[in-house]
Amino acid sequence: MLRFQRGTVKESSSAKLASTSRNGPESSILDPHHSVMELLQRQMEGSEVPSESGVLGESWQQIRESDVGDGGDSNFDQQSNTSAILSSSSEASEDEDLDIQQQLLGGQQEYKNFHMTAEEQLQEQAQGQGFGRPSLLKGTQSRLSEQDSNRSGSVRTIVDKGSCSSSLDEHELNSIFTSDSMSLTKSTGSSSTSFVMPKLSLTYKPSQAKKLLVVGRLSKRFHQDIPREYRQYFHISQSSDPSEFQNYIGIVIVFQELKEFVAMLNRIVQYTDKKPIIPICQPGQRIRVKNILKSFLKNDAITLWYPPVTIANEKSMEKLFKHTVKLVNKLENEEDVLSLSTSDKSLSDETSGYRKNNRRKKHGGKPSTNYSKWITWGISLTIGVSIGYYATYMITTTLLYGKAESHHANEAKGFSITNGNSGSSSISHSTEYYESTISQKGLLRNTIVFIKRTIHNLNGKVGTFFASITQVIKQTPVREDNQFYTLGYMLS
């Protein structure tokens, strides 16, 4: 493997040198690398190495813009070749490995000389070889200082010709760009053209067909008091032409007197087809405004966007604005915005739904205090009267049964004494009556007897009532299909 690499390097270097000798002074950017390769090859073959290389200096001066190619972005092939030589030589003997390493170390010393900056090389060539070009050295130094000063604000552009097959190391590429005048620079700071950032507007502004028209004497004041995030949904008309009413999705009437409100309603009914409205009234006018709206709604002349709102109530106004934004965003998805037939329907549905929810919240959240008081008082009175009646009944029944028992006992004793000659029949009669009264002494038994008698009497009365009703139905000429409905009517 070592011999194969040596032969390959030797053939490539000899071919490059032959092409250089034939072409004369014209050379490429890879000539310095081939010079280093030639030096390494001579050391490995044992030939004499010149103290100074004139080919390196001449080839460095002959670098042109057309010689820069694709090889500027990858690593130098010489490093891979040397690493391959080192790895392959480990398989050979130790003596051969040491000799090769010594030769490579000598070649690397010459390779380091290649990484010298252009300024150092020019100074060495001017002093050692006597080129006699002080003006060239001076011009090169001035170019280097100028490029170093503009390096931070410049953009380097490399012309890609695709004519080079090898690659340069990144350090070598940087030295070339900073040392010669081949790099094409364009300073962004000195450029006459400048990029202007356009102003971007992120605010959403709905079209006129999706806005609410504010009318009335206090319309300007009302529009100024609207928060900024909701102000874009409202518009003030510059003219008092009622024909503009049809161009808006709804009308907000801000009034101070009821006469003005009625006049605006008449104009809306005359020039529009049930345009949705929002009445904004003053404190104390809400009930009368509702009565006026009821008369218009009964005739199906207008559509109510939102219930009347007092201008001084901030919470109600905030709810109105949120409700308006919600409906406008909902109507944006409709295909035909100007034809408000479907829009009016959706608005009426939303308004009715809002009213129902409002009523549910009012009834569910705050129950009537009078209603709860009446229920409490009724239940307490019923329980109290029932307990009192039950206690009174039990006490009175106990007393009555006690008196009756004592009275019947005395009568039985007297009857048995006075009528002692009557025999066993009178005694047995008094004994049976006494036992019957004793069986009724218990409080629980008395209660059960009372309940049974009450139920029996109630059943008798209910049965008599239904019997009279059925008798009346039979006597009246009613069809059999309608007898059930007639019975229900009579019961109600």
From Swiss-Prot:
Record field: compositional bias (Low complexity): 342-351
Compositional bias annotation for Polar residues: 10-26
Annotated TM spans: 374-390
GO biological process, one term: autophagy
Compartments it resides in: Mitochondrion outer membrane; Vacuole membrane; Preautophagosomal structure membrane
Transport keyword on record: no
Disordered: annotated segments: 1-97, 122-157, 342-368
Keywords (A to Z) from UniProt: Autophagy, Membrane, Mitochondrion, Mitochondrion outer membrane, Transmembrane, Transmembrane helix, Vacuole
The keyword Transmembrane helix is annotated on this UniProt entry: yes
Source species, domain of life: Eukaryota
Membrane protein topology class: Single-pass membrane protein
One cellular component (GO) term of this entry: vacuolar membrane
UniProt biased composition (Basic residues): 356-365
Function noted in UniProt: Mitophagy-specific receptor that recruits the autophagic machinery to mitochondria and regulates selective degradation of mitochondria. Mitophagy contributes to regulate mitochondrial quantity and quality by eliminating the mitochondria to a basal level to fulfill cellular energy requirements and preventing excess ROS production. Recruits ATG11 to the surface of mitochondria. Also promotes autophagy-dependent peroxisome degradation.
Family: Belongs to the ATG32 family.
Name of this protein: Autophagy-related protein 32
